[in-house]
Amino acid sequence: MALDIKLLDIIACPVCKGKLHYNKAVHELVCRFDKLAYPLEEGIPVLLENRARQLNSDEMPS
């Protein structure tokens, strides 16, 4: 199931409250400030810090 892009207007990173960006290639929501990637499960964002994946600089979307 795909993410409803309209959600990006109303949800934020639970850590810094910053904007999240959708990485369509890996189906994750990315916080560029905290370098965290939140998974999607059946199109639903899982915005739990303990479920986030730490990104390295090579994985950061431009």
UniProtKB/Swiss-Prot annotation:
Pfam families in alphabetical order: Trm112p (PF03966)
Disulphides: none
Superkingdom, natural source: Bacteria
GO cellular component: cytosol
Gene3D superfamilies associated with the record: 2.20.25.10
Annotated family: Belongs to the UPF0434 family.
Protein name as catalogued: UPF0434 protein ASA_1553
